[in-house]
Design a protein with these regions (language model features):
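Intein/HINT protein-splicing elements and their conserved insertion hotspots or analogous self-processing inserts
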Residues: 1-55, 67-155
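Short hydrophobic/aromatic beta-strand micro-patches
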Residues: 62-66
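A structural-propensity feature for long, helix-poor, extended segments
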Residues: 57-59
Length: 155
């Protein structure tokens, strides 16, 4: 639990931009979902073993940390990659666009779990990356915006 306490302090001090708790799908799925959410790309470290990239990671966390704050983290960590502005996933010689990855991810079970009802009611969902909003405001889509992340620290 000491690591979670340190993580909580790192978050309070602004050294962590975002976090994702791994599950049975491991780093690959976690990093992909984080990228889908923010619209940025990811360059995975060349020395990361592919077996580790796809292995279950129960209890592990992926953190997005500003480059200038990595060395000041108080938790034990391993750098697995970096966020890029090019909207691509890259590892070694392999590269895939974020758009292609999203299509593969959403299209796999499209016949079973439809994401398009075929009806057009005029409403359209869009991926939006990094818009600045005033703290504590609700935008035109009904989304609440905050710069504060709260983590339960009483357990």
């Amino acid at each position: 639990m000491d690591q979670y306490g340190k993580l909580h302090e790192d978050m309070k001090e602004g050294r962590v931009l975002s976090a994702y708790a791994l599950d049975r799908h491991g780093l690959a799925a976690a990093v992909a979902k984080m990228a889908f959410g923010n619209g940025f790309g990811v360059k995975i470290e060349h020395n990361l073993d592919p077996r580790d990239f796809f292995a279950p990671g129960f209890g592990d966390l992926v953190l997005e940390v500003p480059a200038d704050k990595v060395g000041s983290l108080s938790i034990t960590y391993t750098v697995i990659g970096e966020v890029t502005a090019d909207a691509k996933f890259s590892y070694g010689n392999a590269e895939i666009s974020l758009e292609e990855a999203v299509k593969a991810w959403t299209g796999t079970l499209e016949k079973v779990f439809k994401t398009d009802s075929g009806e057009n009611d005029g409403a359209t969902a869009h991926f939006v990356a990094a818009q600045n909003h005033e703290e504590g405001t609700v935008d035109e889509n009904g989304l609440f915006h905050t710069n504060r992340v709260y983590i339960c620290n009483h357990k």
